[in-house]
Curated annotation (Swiss-Prot):
Keywords: Calvin cycle, Carbon dioxide fixation, Chloroplast, Photorespiration, Photosynthesis, Plastid
Record bears the keyword Plastid: yes
Compartmental location: Plastid, Chloroplast
Disulfide linkage: none
Superkingdom in the source lineage: Eukaryota
Subunit structure: Heterohexadecamer of 8 large and 8 small subunits.
The name this protein goes by in its record: Ribulose bisphosphate carboxylase small subunit
Length: 138
């Protein structure tokens, strides 16, 4: 099951050249660029682990690509995304984010149904991978 999170989630995986163009766009908009990774891909898990510090006032995509590749090498079986953050007053939020690395196998989610009062049913999801210990996922 292909996970769809981020700006280009329904498109094929971005090539390194396409990633470079997106980084150029983020630089032109003066965004702080961060690299994050996780092995818990639940849709409400918005707090991924940071890879190093965010890159502020970058003028060239090379250092960002270097950090992406270092993260890919160290965390090859994790989801890795690039995040562009605007510090502009009134926005102060993530403007763009997209996945640049995925595990080879994406097992998907388990739908959990719970009966509640008055015969109502509550639904939740849990990633199949979270049944395994954190260091054994993917």
């Amino acid at each position: 099951m292909r996970i769809t999170q981020g700006t280009f989630s329904f498109l094929p995986d971005l090539t390194d050249e396409q990633i470079k163009k997106q980084i150029d766009y983020m630089i032109s908009k003066k965004l702080a660029i961060g690299i994050e990774y996780t092995n818990d891909i639940h849709p409400r898990n918005s707090f991924w682990e940071m890879w190093g510090l965010p890159l502020f006032e970058v003028t060239d995509p090379a250092p960002v690509l270097f950090e992406i590749n270092a993260c890919r090498k160290a965390k090859s079986n994790f989801y890795i995304k690039v995040v562009g953050f605007s510090s502009e007053r009134g926005i102060e939020s993530t403007i763009i984010s997209f996945i640049v690395n995925r595990p080879k196998h994406e097992p998907g989610f388990n739908l959990i149904r719970q009966e509640d009062k008055s015969r109502s049913i509550k639904y939740s999801i849990q990633a199949y991978e979270t049944y395994k210990p954190e260091d054994q996922r993917y």
